[in-house]
Design a protein with these regions (language model features):
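Sec-dependent N-terminal signal peptides of Gram-positive bacterial secreted proteins and lipoproteins
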Residues: 3-23
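Bacterial lipoprotein signal-peptidase II cleavage site
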Residues: 18-30, 37
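Immediate post-signal peptide segment of exported/extracytoplasmic ligand-binding proteins
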Residues: 36-38, 43-66, 92-101, 193-199
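Extracytoplasmic "Venus flytrap"
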Residues: 54-56, 60-82, 106-113, 135-136, ...
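Beta-alpha junction/loop-to-helix N-cap segments that form part of ligand/metal-binding clefts
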Residues: 74-81, 93-166, 235-240, 263-267, ...
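Extracytoplasmic ligand/sensor domains, especially the bilobed periplasmic-binding protein
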Residues: 128-231, 279-305
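Extracellular/periplasmic periplasmic-binding protein-like sensory domains
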Residues: 270-342, 396-398, 402-404, 408-414
Length: 415
């Protein structure tokens, strides 16, 4: 079921402020729902008007496609929460071009078809200035032709090299804001061979496109060390019983297991491997250290290594501030999907500011002038082409807690 959530400023502010124990009232300057907002620091303190400039006028509307229903609906929950946080921050600081922003959310349903339908509904609305795509390379690639058709700036959350190629060569309206899997997978294999001393590997991967791509990249990185996987075991999205797959891995005698899958399947896979008493290191694609995976797998998520875009205990000050605010408002650790949405909306607003306009083409052109932009996750540089994300984190998960080993950087040369 597709859902349309036209998120107005008043709704966003009510949700955010209620979450942190404050209350809001409309300013005397305007009586509409998009009025500037006063805040009270606490019930025992005298209310003071914000000294920030107020946003007024018609809202600047930004579309967001995310998964609100189905097995991946936790992603949509994180995304929606982050949209509220960044909207409240921007609007209380004067908005963009002096106007408030409004995030319009469509349910991508967790399928390629759902992602395209959600995207086209937003793109066909002339009031939408730019669109944030869902947390999947597959969905981003499926949306790419529509982005080109409607000529609207679209940010993709996926990390596939195939998506990267689309952004750099095929579609000037599509921007990949995560460090690419080719960088992340190579970094994880390098660490496992050179630091952990692992000699033999089994590969288990989902057959959907992005996970299969990650498995291929892991395998290519192993080959650069003269290592071939002792066994490769594919499975399909939605698999709940991995016993036969794990049996193949056990029979192979591999020292470590490489896994490539989305968060739900990753969590089930980890649970079942550890429940069988297998203690071998698991080297996972970026979702294996995500709070969604950790929440689902719990303490069984142990001795798991991952090259990830994000963990809540990030050393990045801007990311740490977001993680703290998210925890305060929602009681949960800030997931990758939330951090990505926060950065995507921030970058789009930066492009609108640089353009000095809400014209779609002007905003897209302005996006290509952004360089060295510090987000919550990493720095972004969009000046030469459409892949903008520059870094990640090498992480070890110990009994459900992500510990950062080192930062991963992917420098971009500006000519």
């Amino acid at each position: 079921m597709k859902k349309m959530l036209a998120v107005t400023l008043a709704v966003l502010m009510a949700g955010i402020v209620a979450g942190c124990g404050t209350k809001t009232e409309s300013s005397a300057a305007a009586e509409t729902e998009t009025a500037a907002v006063k805040s009270e620091a606490s019930d025992t303190e005298q209310a003071q008007e914000s000294q920030e400039p107020s946003a007024s006028g018609d809202p600047i509307r930004i579309g967001l496609t995310t998964v609100l229903t189905g097995d991946r609906s936790l992603e949509g929950e994180y995304a929606s929460n982050a949209a509220k946080i960044i909207t409240e921050e921007i609007n209380t600081q004067g908005g963009v071009l002096g106007r408030p922003i409004e995030i319009v959310i469509e349910d991508a349903l967790g399928t390629d078809v759902g992602a395209v339908n959600a995207y086209r509904k937003l793109a066909s609305d002339d009031s939408i200035v730019a669109i944030v795509g869902p947390d999947s390379s597959n969905d981003g690639m499926a949306q790419s032709p529509s982005a080109l058709e409607f000529k609207i700036l679209t940010t993709a959350q996926g990390s596939s090299p195939t998506l990267k190629n689309m952004c750099n060569n095929d579609n000037p309206y599509l921007f990949q804001l995560r460090a690419c899997d080719d960088t992340l997978c190579a970094a994880l294999i390098k660490y496992s061979v050179e630091e952990l001393g692992i000699k033999s590997y089994a590969v288990m991967h989902d057959t959907e496109t992005s996970s299969a791509d990650q498995a291929r990249l892991f395998t290519e990185a192993l080959k650069s060390y003269g290592i071939e996987p002792v066994v490769t075991v594919p499975f399909t999205t939605g698999t709940k019983d991995f016993s036969s797959h794990i049996a193949q891995v056990q029979a192979s005698g591999a020292d470590a297991i490489i896994g490539a899958a989305f968060q739900t399947e990753a969590a089930i896979l980890i649970q079942q491997i550890r429940s069988l008493g297998i203690e071998a290191p698991i080297l996972g694609s970026n979702g294996f250290a995500d709070p969604v995976t950790i929440q689902l797998a719990g303490e069984l998520n142990d001795n798991v290594y991952c090259a990830s875009a994000w963990v809540p205990n990030t050393p990045n000050p801007k990311g740490a501030a977001l993680a703290e605010k998210y925890k305060e408002l929602y009681g949960d650790d800030c997931g990758k999907a939330a951090a990505q949405i926060y950065d995507h909306i921030s970058l789009i607003c930066e492009a609108i500011t640089l353009a000095g306009s809400t014209d779609r083409e002007a905003v897209r052109e302005a996006m290509n002038t952004i360089g060295d932009y510090q987000g919550a996750i990493t720095k972004y540089d969009c000046r030469t082409n459409g892949d903008c994300g520059r870094g990640g984190l090498l992480v070890k998960v110990v009994k459900g807690k992500a510990e950062i080993i080192s930062e991963i950087t992917s420098e971009k040369v500006i000519e």
